[in-house]
């Protein structure tokens, strides 16, 4: 084999979580020298010491191997023993190449999305109504943006109230009050309020937040992270004085892997290339369907003392995405992480019959406490990262500053590496040591669960670091197969192997497994028998409870009842309106009594009297002013203007006319026949608010009497008026009949008065506040002689009213005469018709100064 010859060496690296192999395929001969630890020089093969020699095709290099295996390449060694020719050969400049692979890690990048609260809770506020409110419906307010809302409002960063943060109110219905007062079974109340007659309790249910918050993070796809370290050592001979000394000089290190796939040594004698990774027989966990929840450090939470920060990343939680609602836009659902104010408030009214805290279950704190109990009892957690493998922690990537969740791979992985070295021969030195099983045991666990673990403690009793393999050779029926595990153990040190045991049958009982220990040469050095017991699984089914069983699942049956398949017929007496009526009466009574209770104080009574007198004086003052007459006439008092229908001293309805100052005048001569009594009006208005309640009662009694009057009573009152129509006529005296007759004279023009609020005003252009339209009256034939119709004299609008002055329109406004036609009786004619226009007339040219009413 010529000097400087370039050969290709393919190295396949097989690794467990902390172990790796390298398979070397080369043309050079490989010699394996067994190092038993009795020599100070681990490379005694160079000094021609005795060793076992054979051709090596594969070489294992385990990550974290601590130098148990070396790939030693020698070029131009001075002496080499040729097994074929049975003689020594001379070689020069030997060198050593070592390969090592770090533990394989899976990194899961995660990205921040939102914040959710650790444990929203429900706060209940019980309230009784005050003097100004009666009944439980007034004791609690949950209206939006109501400053008196019993729960108050949460506000955002801008200080604006958050929608639905006011919670909801629960009150006693009238049926519940009746049932509570008569010792009937009262329905469950969420707040436990006391529902009885005259009771005023109500409860506000408010959602509040815990001091601890969690960040919600999106988890990305996993990436494999490891590195392969290749080192070269050159043997250099130096002459010091009269002595020749040799030493190994570090020729540099090449680090390759998924990120840096190739490299060259310092002296260029070694070139390493990472080809790729073989696929594992087992799929790695995919966490893209879950959110990573990380507790958030704030001023209100001390991470040194808070229990949910105690174990760092080991207490983070991986929750299914469908269990988290972090978006404020919805959907708003109860009993999910990130429950919103809208979801909590949407419980009403049915939520009042639910338990306190309903809608606020399945929060991060609940998941944390559940997994903490499982971990303390030796069971596999549901949500902690431990469920998916051995968690190493959270690291930060150097390339993009992203944080990644890091797991250690517990599976055999294979990497392919190509080495190009200038060499003639490769010598393999292989460490081997004796070992023994100190203890092998398994804890009892529940069948069909993932809580079984088998532990094997191994000790290296040799003098060098060596590899050991633990194989679970055989187990009882129903126990799943367990994968082989391996580790490099330092001299006189121990290592603990953990295997996950699964029982794949319902039936519990005694079980066993045989544990075997092998050394680096695959020679069995020790074995042990492990016994353990599995229990029947305990299953919890909805509405059936929990039970541990042996012969399959059974659910408790419901007691047979005679269920009604069709809607039952209505029966019995429904008195549901009584509670409503009683509630209204009680509310009025409570209000009245609260007013009287307030009036018990002498100062309050004096202040109220002065206030009522002041209001009466204001009413009288406005009555004496021209613009305030309407206010003063409310109730009684105040100036009357124009024509007014009222009863005279004999009780008959007559039409009275008043001038601008409120004095009564004669309709024909316009002379004052009854001056206005201002002193009387002033006195009545001063005490008006004192007698207002009695005045209202008086009018109420009069209205009731009018409603209860028999149909014939009006006819009897009208007897003797000369009306032969049997009482259908509303005319009560000769004066009224004469006025009606004037309106019905042939060719007589009458004027119909309107206001801007009347229906016909919408068809006119700027009619003003009060106006009139000229027309004629027609007597209609029928069962009653007092039926008349008003029709427009001409269906056009000639004038408009601007600033209380009549002005001619630029063009005539055509009108629909049908809208202005109106059927009138005698009383209506007297009220709205006149022979002279009282207000500006809009459809005739007659000019007359209008009278302002």
Curated annotation (Swiss-Prot):
This is Hapless 2. HAP2/GCS1 family members mediate membrane fusion between gametes in a broad range of eukaryotes, ranging from algae and higher plants to protozoans and cnidaria, suggesting they are derived from an ancestral gamete fusogen. They function similar to viral fusogens, by inserting part of their extracellular domain into the lipid bilayer of an adjoining cell. It holds the Pfam family HAP2-GCS1. Keywords: Cell membrane, Disulfide bond, Fertilization, Glycoprotein, Lipid-binding, Membrane, Signal, Transmembrane, Transmembrane helix. One of its GO terms (cellular component) is plasma membrane. Residues 23-603 are extracellular. Glycans are attached at residue 529. Residues 625-853 are cytoplasmic. Residues 1-22 form the signal peptide. Detected in sperm (at protein level). Detected in testis seminal ducts. One of its GO terms (molecular function) is lipid binding. During fertilization, required on male gametes for their fusion with female gametes. Probably initiates the fusion of gamete cell membranes by inserting part of its extracellular domain into the cell membrane of a female gamete. Disulfide bonds join 33-51, 151-206, 170-352, 172-195, 334-359, 475-513. It is a single-pass type I membrane protein. One of its GO terms (biological process) is single fertilization.
């Amino acid at each position: 084999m010529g000097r400087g010859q370039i050969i290709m060496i393919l190295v396949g690296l097989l690794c467990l979580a902390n172990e790796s192999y390298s398979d070397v395929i080369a043309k050079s001969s490989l010699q394996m020298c067994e190092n038993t630890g009795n020599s100070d020089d681990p490379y005694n093969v160079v000094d021609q010491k005795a060793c076992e020699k054979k051709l090596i095709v594969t070489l294992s290099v385990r990550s974290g191997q601590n130098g148990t295996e070396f790939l030693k390449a020698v070029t131009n060694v001075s002496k080499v023993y040729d097994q074929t020719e049975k003689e020594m050969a001379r070689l020069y400049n030997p060198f050593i190449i070592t390969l090592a692979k770090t533990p394989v890690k899976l990194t899961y990048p995660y990205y921040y999305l939102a914040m959710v609260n650790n444990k929203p809770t429900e706060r209940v506020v019980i309230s009784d109504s005050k003097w100004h409110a009666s009944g439980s419906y007034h004791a609690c307010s949950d209206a939006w943006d109501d400053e008196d809302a019993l729960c108050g409002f949460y506000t955002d960063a801008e200080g604006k109230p958050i929608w639905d943060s006011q919670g909801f109110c629960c009150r006693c219905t009238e049926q519940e009050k009746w049932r509570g007062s008569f010792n009937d079974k009262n329905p469950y109340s969420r707040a436990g309020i006391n529902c009885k007659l005259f009771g005023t309790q109500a409860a506000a249910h408010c959602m509040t937040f815990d001091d601890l918050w969690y960040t919600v993070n999106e988890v990305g796809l996993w990436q494999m992270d490891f590195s392969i370290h290749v080192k070269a050592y050159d043997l250099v001979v130096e002459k010091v004085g009269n002595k020749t000394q040799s030493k190994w000089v570090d020729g540099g290190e090449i680090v390759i892997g998924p990120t840096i796939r190739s490299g060259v040594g310092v002296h260029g004698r070694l070139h390493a290339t990472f080809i790729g990774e073989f696929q594992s027989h087992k799929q790695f966990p995919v966490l893209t369907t879950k959110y990573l929840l990380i507790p958030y450090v704030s001023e209100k939470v001390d991470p040194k003392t808070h229990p949910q920060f105690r174990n760092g990343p080991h207490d983070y939680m991986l929750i299914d995405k469908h269990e988290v609602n972090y978006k404020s836009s919805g959907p708003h659902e109860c009993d999910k992480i990130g429950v919103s104010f809208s979801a909590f408030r949407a419980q009403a009214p049915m939520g009042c019959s639910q338990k306190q805290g309903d809608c606020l279950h399945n929060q991060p704190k609940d998941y944390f406490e559940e997994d903490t109990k499982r971990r303390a009892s030796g069971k596999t957690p549901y949500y902690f990262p431990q469920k998916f493998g051995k968690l190493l922690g959270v690291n930060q990537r150097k390339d993009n500053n992203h944080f990644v969740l890091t797991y250690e791979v517990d599976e055999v992985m294979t990497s392919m590496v190509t080495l190009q070295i200038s060499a003639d021969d490769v010598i393999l030195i292989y460490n081997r040591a004796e070992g023994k099983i100190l203890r092998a045991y398994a804890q009892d666990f529940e069948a069909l669960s993932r809580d079984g673990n088998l532990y094997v403690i191994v000790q290296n009793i040799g003098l060098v670091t060596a590899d050991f393999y633990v194989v679970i050779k055989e187990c009882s029926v129903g126990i799943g197969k367990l994968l082989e595990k391996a580790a490099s153990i330092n001299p006189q040190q121990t290592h603990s192997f953990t295997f996950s045991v699964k029982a794949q049958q319902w039936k519990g009982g005694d079980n066993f497994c045989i544990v075997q220990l092998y050394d680096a040469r695959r020679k069995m050095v020790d074995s042990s028998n492990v016994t353990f017991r599995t229990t029947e699984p305990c299953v919890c089914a909805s509405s059936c409870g929990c039970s541990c069983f042996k012969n399959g699942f059974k659910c408790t049956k419901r007691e047979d009842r005679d269920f009604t398949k069709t809607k039952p017929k209505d029966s019995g007496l429904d008195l549901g309106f009584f509670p409503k009526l009683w509630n209204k009466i009680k509310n009025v009574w409570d209000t009245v009594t609260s007013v009287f209770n307030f009036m018990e104080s002498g100062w309050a009574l004096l202040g109220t009297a002065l206030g009522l007198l002041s209001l009466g004086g204001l009413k009288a003052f406005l009555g004496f002013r021209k613009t305030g007459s309407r206010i003063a006439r409310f109730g009684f008092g105040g100036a009357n203007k124009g024509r007014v229908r009222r009863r005279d001293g004999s009780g008959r309805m007559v039409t009275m006319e008043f001038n601008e100052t409120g004095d009564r005048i004669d309709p024909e001569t316009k002379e004052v026949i009854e001056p206005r009594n201002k002193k009387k009006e002033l006195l009545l208005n001063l005490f008006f608010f004192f007698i207002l309640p009695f005045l209202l009662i008086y009018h109420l009694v009069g209205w009731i009497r009018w409603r209860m009057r028999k149909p014939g009573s009006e006819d009897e009152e009208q007897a003797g008026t000369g009306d032969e129509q049997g009482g259908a006529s509303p005319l009560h005296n000769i004066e009224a009949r004469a006025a009606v007759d004037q309106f019905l004279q042939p060719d007589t023009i009458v004027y119909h008065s309107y206001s801007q609020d009347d229906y016909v005003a919408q068809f006119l252009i700027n009619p003003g506040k009060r106006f009139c339209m000229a027309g004629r009256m027609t007597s209609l034939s029928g069962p009653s002689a007092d039926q008349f119709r008003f029709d427009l004299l001409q269906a056009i609008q000639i004038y408009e009213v601007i600033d209380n002055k009549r002005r001619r329109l630029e063009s005539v406004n055509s009108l629909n005469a049908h809208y202005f036609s109106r059927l009138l009786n005698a009383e209506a004619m007297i009220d709205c018709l006149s022979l002279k226009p009282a207000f500006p007339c809009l459809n005739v040219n007659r000019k007359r100064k209008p009278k302002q009413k």
